[in-house]
Amino acid sequence: ACVVYDIGRRRTLSAIGHEGWHQFNNRHFKYRLPSWLDEGIAMLFETCTYENGMYSFDAARNYPRLGALSETLMNGKQMRLGELIATSPGEVLATDENEAVMAFYSQSYALVRFLREADHGKRVTRYHRLLWDGMLGQWPLDPDASRTAEDRNLPRTVQWNRVVGPRLFERY
């Protein structure tokens, strides 16, 4: 189920694409994804075009995220990679600092695009393996982390993100 509010055509479709990814992931992946990966992928679905009765997603045209990334970098507010892959959205939202929120989301978007696209797709096979293994529940996790990854009724805690995010990034 999904509740949608009309916040203007572009923003409404952006929110539907983003939240639609979360619903898809929640339904079809055995393991939930670490926050940087889940949010990074969700932002790939925020920009779409409609032509001949079909919607097409175009991650490269997500100008709001690209603008936020540019602003983050220009202001020197970027997160270190180790911090980014170990952070959860709740942590940055709790700071009540717009720059921290912008940094987390825009850098997660950029990191996922980098893994998919950089160097003519050099890392895309490992990126796909990371997703495939998450979908099948085959990540090399200890029993507690595996239980949290699999049981959507358990909260994805800050500690889980701190352990699992970096572990998966290094593994894949």
Which residues does each PLM region occupy?
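Juxtacatalytic substrate-recognition/specificity segment
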Residues: A1-P34, T49, P140, R156
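Acidic/His/Gly-enriched intrinsically disordered linker/tail segments
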Residues: F29-Y172
